[in-house]
Amino acid sequence: MGQIRVPRKGVTPSELANVLSRRLGGGFEVAADDGTVIVRRSPLSAAVVRIRNAPGATVFRVRGAGVPLVSLGTSRAVADALRKSPEFRGV
């Protein structure tokens, strides 16, 4: 799905998981792991978000996991939620 760069440094996986849980709603299962957040819509559809720090920003890399066509919708929903999230606009 691509990369989303937000102008906020030091976003943690647990913080990202909390924001995605609120933004995506009850139809998604969100779990944080070491530097990665996994978002599942169904057993066949998931998105993996990796967190990378950049100078003055945080970069989220969103990729689909599972059945390709089904995962595309999940990864797109995650990427849209990240882009529209006011929590990551800056401190």
Could you tell me what each predicted segment is?
Residues L20-F28, L82-R89:
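Hydrophobic, Leu/Ile/Phe/Ala-enriched alpha-helical segments that form helix-helix packing faces
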Residues M1-G26:
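Terminal, regulation- and interaction-focused segments at domain boundaries
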Residues R23-I51:
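Amphipathic, interaction-prone secondary-structure segments
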Residues L24-G25, V49, G56-F60, V78-L82:
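Short, low-complexity, polar/charged sequence segments that are solvent-exposed and flexible
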Residues V48-G73:
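Intrinsically disordered, low-complexity regulatory segments enriched in Ser/Thr/Pro
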Residues R5-V11, R41, V62-G64:
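Short beta-strand-to-loop capping motifs
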Residues G66-V91:
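Intrinsically disordered, low-complexity regulatory regions enriched in serine/threonine/proline
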Residues M1-Q3, D34-V37, P55-V59:
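A generic structural signal for beta-strand entry/edge sites
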